């Protein structure tokens, strides 16, 4: 189902949601951190989704053990490097990794700006080693409130040339986008792209707000757009992309089952929607699974899957020249 003549991308992938269970175990031992289990087999149920979670917030707790072992900046550097290694192993040519430095720093009171620098270093080294192209998206974790998001924003701005876009993630229902207008004004002033998690837990109004008030060029998840025909028309007309994450939306109970996922309808409506993983380490899936298992189960035809793959590159926060070069590089192989 993957067209090997086209670039394979993953543009909605959380770096801090892709910490290997084996790495959690090793870092726990290295830093003498008490874990809920001492073997890989018994740890996995604590750090991966085994059964669908009742809601988004419950799903997000599965990420916590991964960041609890980030006891040093070296540990942050390691998981960033391993994220690129994982991307290469699964055949990705281009990946946009998003991360919340405040969340990564929290358990051990690491310097937030230091976490940003460590992630940049690890990703850069990974790209050099494995030949994957990557860009970084800074996440503000809305769950921790406006002041914490301000701290994350300042840390990103200290490395503004290494950050491609700003995102807002976390508890969408409890912390609406309207709380973060000034943060996104500064992000746009910095020349960054904007993508926002919206319409995953909250309704279509959250997506409208992300676009109109925060300046979103892409929407993370966006499943609730299916409830608003005018919104779907607007997304298609304005070419505002939807970063679909099929398996994730089932695991968070945002969508009841793959057969009911709106991605097929979005594509039929002319919306620029792509296939992505979200938190592959926590989900126990990879991009190959999303294309070859999840997408067909969601009712996508072979041609629709190919279109979603094309959309992944079209939606990417790359220049037209960078996209052309990547297409040519893959086609020449």
Curated annotation (Swiss-Prot):
Protein name in the entry: Adenosine deaminase
Taxonomic source organism: Escherichia coli (strain SE11)
GO BP: any one term: purine ribonucleoside monophosphate biosynthetic process
Gene behind this protein: add
Necessary cofactors: Zn(2+)
GO molecular function, one term: 2'-deoxyadenosine deaminase activity
Covalent S-S links between cysteines: none
EC code: 3.5.4.4
Feature type site, description Important for catalytic activity: 221
């Amino acid at each position: 189902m993957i067209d090997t003549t086209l670039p394979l991308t993953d543009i909605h992938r959380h770096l801090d949601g892709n910490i290997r269970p084996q790495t959690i175990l090793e870092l726990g031992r290295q830093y003498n951190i008490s874990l809920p289990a001492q073997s890989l087999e018994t740890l996995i149920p604590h750090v991966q989704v085994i059964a669908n979670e009742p809601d988004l917030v419950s799903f997000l707790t599965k990420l916590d053990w991964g960041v609890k072992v980030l006891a040093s900046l070296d540990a942050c550097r390691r998981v960033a490097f391993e994220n690129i290694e994982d991307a290469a192993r699964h055949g990705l040519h281009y990946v946009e990794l998003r991360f919340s430095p405040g969340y990564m720093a929290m358990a051990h009171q690491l310097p937030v700006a230091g976490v940003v620098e460590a992630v940049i270093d690890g990703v850069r080294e990974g790209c050099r080693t494995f030949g994957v192209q990557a860009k970084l998206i800074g996440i503000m974790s809305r769950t921790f409130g406006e002041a914490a998001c301000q701290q994350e924003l300042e840390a990103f701005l200290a490395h503004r040339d290494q950050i491609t876009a700003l995102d807002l993630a976390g508890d969408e229902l409890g912390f609406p986008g309207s709380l973060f207008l000034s943060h996104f004004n500064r992000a746009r002033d910095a020349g960054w792209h904007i993508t926002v998690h919206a319409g995953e837990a909250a309704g279509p109004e959250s997506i409208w707000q992300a676009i109109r008030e925060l300046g979103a060029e892409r929407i993370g998840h966006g499943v609730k757009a299916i409830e608003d025909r005018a919104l779907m028309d607007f997304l298609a007309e304005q070419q505002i992309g939807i970063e679909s994450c099929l398996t994730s939306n089932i695991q968070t109970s945002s969508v009841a089952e793959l057969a009911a996922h709106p991605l097929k309808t979005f594509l039929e409506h002319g919306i620029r929607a792509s296939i992505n993983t979200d938190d592959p380490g926590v989900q126990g899936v990879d991009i190959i699974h999303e294309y070859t298992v999840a997408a067909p189960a969601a009712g996508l035809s072979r041609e629709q899957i190919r279109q979603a793959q094309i959309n992944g590159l079209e939606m990417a926060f790359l220049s037209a020249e960078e996209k052309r070069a990547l297409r040519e590089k893959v086609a020449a192989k």
